[in-house]
C-alpha cells in the first residue's frame, strides 16, 4: 500500500507557517497595547529627592502600600479588605510602607520603600470572610470529608495620601 506522504507533509508545514505568522502578529498587537505611553514619566526615589517637584495629594493620585505581607493599590476613599489586624474599629492608622506613588503624569518607585510619603487610613470593620467549603474524597474507597473555613478580615478606608517631611537621622 503506497501513501502520498508528501502532500500531507506540505499541508502540515504550511499550517505551521500560518500558525507562526499568526503568533507573530499577535505579539505585535500585544506589544502595541501594552507599551507605556511616552507622556508617563517613571521616576525613582533618588531622582525624586533631587527634584522635589512631585506632590500627588488629591483624588487623582494612587499608592501601593504594604500591609501584613501583601501589597494593595489604593486611592483616596477606597475600602480594602486585608487579613485581620489587631486594631480597634474607628481608629486612625498611618501606613508608612509606601512602595509606589503616582498620578496620571508621573510615578515614583521606592527602593523598596518611599520614606516621605504616608497613607492615612481608618479601620471600618472587623468581620469574617465568606465561608469556604472544603470537600475531599477518594474515588471507589467510600472516603468523603467535608470541612469549612471562615477567615477573619479587617476593612480599611483610605483617608488620603500625604507627602511628609523627609526623615533624616542625626548622630551625635
From Swiss-Prot:
SUPFAM superfamilies, A to Z: L21p-like
Keyword Transit peptide in annotation: yes
Record keyword Ribosomal protein present: yes
Compartment(s) of residence: Mitochondrion
GO function term, MF aspect, one: structural constituent of ribosome
Keywords carried by this UniProt record: Mitochondrion, Ribonucleoprotein, Ribosomal protein, Transit peptide
GO cellular component term, pick one: mitochondrial large ribosomal subunit
A Pfam family matched in the record: Ribosomal_L21p
Residues annotated as transit peptide in the record: 1-20
BP terms from Gene Ontology: translation
Family named by the database record: Belongs to the bacterial ribosomal protein bL21 family.
PANTHER family with a match to the protein in the record: 50S RIBOSOMAL PROTEIN L21, LARGE RIBOSOMAL SUBUNIT PROTEIN BL21M
The name this protein goes by in its record: Large ribosomal subunit protein bL21m
Lineage, top ranks: Eukaryota, Amoebozoa, Evosea, Eumycetozoa, Dictyostelia
Gene from which the chain derives: mrpl21
